[in-house]
From Swiss-Prot:
Protein name: ATP synthase subunit beta
Catalyzed chemical reaction(s): ATP + H2O + 4 H(+)(in) = ADP + phosphate + 5 H(+)(out)
SMART domains registered for this protein in UniProt: AAA (SM00382)
Gene Ontology cellular component annotations, sorted alphabetically: plasma membrane; proton-transporting ATP synthase complex
Complex and partners: F-type ATPases have 2 components, CF(1) - the catalytic core - and CF(0) - the membrane proton channel. CF(1) has five subunits: alpha(3), beta(3), gamma(1), delta(1), epsilon(1). CF(0) has three main subunits: a(1), b(2) and c(9-12). The alpha and beta chains form an alternating ring which encloses part of the gamma chain. CF(1) is attached to CF(0) by a central stalk formed by the gamma and epsilon chains, while a peripheral stalk is formed by the delta and b chains.
MF terms in GO: ATP binding; ATP hydrolysis activity; proton-transporting ATP synthase activity, rotational mechanism
HAMAP family in UniProt: ATP_synth_beta_bact
Family affiliation: Belongs to the ATPase alpha/beta chains family.
Keyword annotations: ATP synthesis, ATP-binding, Cell inner membrane, Cell membrane, CF(1), Hydrogen ion transport, Ion transport, Membrane, Nucleotide-binding, Translocase, Transport
Main location: membrane
UniProt-annotated location(s): Cell inner membrane
Organism: Thermotoga neapolitana (strain ATCC 49049 / DSM 4359 / NBRC 107923 / NS-E)
InterPro entries, sorted: AAA+_ATPase (IPR003593), ATP-synt_VA_C (IPR055190), ATP_synth_F1_bsu (IPR005722), ATPase_a/bsu_AS (IPR020003), ATPase_alpha/beta_chains (IPR050053), ATPase_F1/V1/A1_a/bsu_N (IPR004100), ATPase_F1/V1/A1_a/bsu_N_sf (IPR036121), ATPase_F1/V1/A1_a/bsu_nucl-bd (IPR000194)
Length: 468
């Protein structure tokens, strides 16, 4: 298809715009078209979704269509929407079409990549299953992240999701020399602004790219912004050979945006009014997130569950792609235990002795067993008190309370608020610490010594100070 072909608008239906071209100059599916809004003088990008006959193509706008009218000239760029890639985009905020929105000047990147790209061929993909060490005890022990895997974050407002995300970004940047890409998909602009300011203050912005298509933007932008972020991450993986963390907040909004444009494109809705192409849309995004021989993209996706119904098609389709789930619990946050990760609800497919090793597996299962037994005893304790328990059950409660507190840990990005220096805990230290608690070697150590500690050696030091 020749670049520069010209057509004109023949219909505008909200974010969907119909454009007529000469029959011999029809643009390809997913090509980006450009039209100038006569009211604002701004260039609006339209993405071709369907060829509907008689030279007419149906497109979805990446910006508001207010001011567009029939007869306006439209130019075919001859290529899909492209995103700037490379180190020049680090520390910047972009929109869906790769334009900077942080008022920090133009992005002078040497390359731009199309946002529609095939997933890596099977022969290019890495078949080794490897743990991505995060330095966060509760995650590394109970819900280990596979390198190149997909992790779902579940949690309501105010349970520490953003702080956990920022700590992951910091640890990947400093401990793994990796980069992070954050895709804000259909979330609040205020939250995006707060994240940007917090990243500046905590010093992680320089290793991160932020790509936003927020709640106030048209569905086309919200639907495609995750692909823009993923393309930037793919460059760091494939060209720079890095381990990249890709955060998508929120994957449900990606589905929701697709559902909004689907009916306008004339598609028959499927279950619960979602688009009939739901599984395909999700698959095209998720299959590109993987490890190759050069590097990896590990994706952490916040998942909003509508009306707490996990059978809803949007979250249900997402679950099929996940390798691990991290559930943040308000009950744990209220106890003042951070990160507020629920150790019983969180899980990982790679928590298997064949992958993580026999010792890691047995310690993790031992921790969950003690915590589950403690949870089962809660009702009895509430009615009768701890004194009425059998000696074995008292020992379970005794160790469970120490495990609960040892699962907490101070974060580097929260140092300014807590006054406690952050701790990165290597996986071997995490396993050793919990093994000693399970073996009863620390039964005489006071509970307070375990709270907000890093390694088990730090707990022992604190216990010595308390006794002296």
């Amino acid at each position: 298809m020749a670049k520069g072909s010209k057509g004109y608008i023949v219909g505008v239906m909200g974010p969907v715009v119909d454009v007529k071209f000469p029959e011999e100059e029809l643009p390809d599916i997913f090509n980006a078209l450009e039209v100038v809004n006569p009211q604002t003088g701004q260039k609006i990008v339209l993405e071709v979704e369907q060829l509907i006959g008689d030279g007419v193509v149906r497109t979805v706008a990446m910006d508001s269509t207010d001011g567009l009218m029939k007869g306006l000239e439209v130019v075919d760029t001859g290529e899909p929407i492209t995103a700037p890639v490379g180190k020049e985009v680090l520390g910047r905020i972009l929109n869906v079409i790769g334009e900077p929105v942080d008022e920090a000047g133009e992005i002078k990147s040497k390359e731009r990549w199309p946002i529609h790209r095939p997933a890596p061929e099977l022969i290019e993909q890495s078949t080794e299953i490897e743990i991505l060490e995060t330095g966060i005890k509760v995650i590394d022990l109970l819900a280990p992240f596979p390198k190149g895997g997909k992790i779902g974050f579940f949690g309501g407002a105010g349970v520490g999701k953003t702080v956990l995300v920022m700590e992951l970004i910091r640890n990947i940047a400093i401990e793994h020399k990796g980069f992070s890409v954050f895709a804000g998909v259909g979330e609040r602009t205020r939250e995006g602004n707060e994240l940007w300011l917090e990243m500046q203050e905590s010093g992680v912005l320089g290793n991160t790219v932020l790509v936003f298509g927020q709640m106030n933007e048209p569905p086309g932008a919200r639907f495609r912004v995750a692909l823009t972020a993923l393309t930037i991450a793919e460059y760091f993986r494939d060209v720079e050979g890095r381990d990249v963390l890709l955060f998508i907040d929120n994957i449900f909004r990606f589905v929701q945006a697709g559902s909004e444009v689907s009916a306008l494109l004339g598609r028959m809705p499927s279950a619960v009014g979602y688009q009939p192409t739901l599984a395909t849309d999700m698959g095209e995004l998720q299959e590109r997130i993987t490890s190759t021989r050069r590097g990896s993209i590990t994706s952490v996706q916040a998942i909003y569950v509508p009306a707490d119904d996990i059978t809803d098609p949007a979250p249900a389709t997402t679950f099929a792609h996940l390798d691990a789930t991290v559930v943040l619990s308000r009950r744990i946050a209220e106890l003042g235990l951070y990160p507020a990760v629920d150790p019983l609800d969180s899980s990982s497919k790679i928590l298997d002795p064949a992958v993580v090793g026999r010792e890691h597996y047995e310690v993790a299962r031992g921790v969950q067993e003690v915590l589950q037994r403690y949870k089962d005893l809660q009702d009895i304790i509430a009615i009768l008190g701890v004194e009425e328990l059998s000696p074995e059950d008292k020992l379970v409660v005794h160790r469970a309370r120490r495990i609960q507190r040892f699962l907490s840990q101070p974060f580097h990005v929260a140092e300014r608020f807590t006054g406690r220096p952050g701790k990165y805990v290597p996986l071997e230290e995490t396993i050793r610490g919990f093994k000693e608690i399970l073996d009863g070697k620390l039964d005489d150590v006071p509970e307070q010594a375990f709270l907000m500690a890093g390694t088990i050696d730090e707990v022992k030091e604190r216990a010595k100070e308390m006794r002296s």
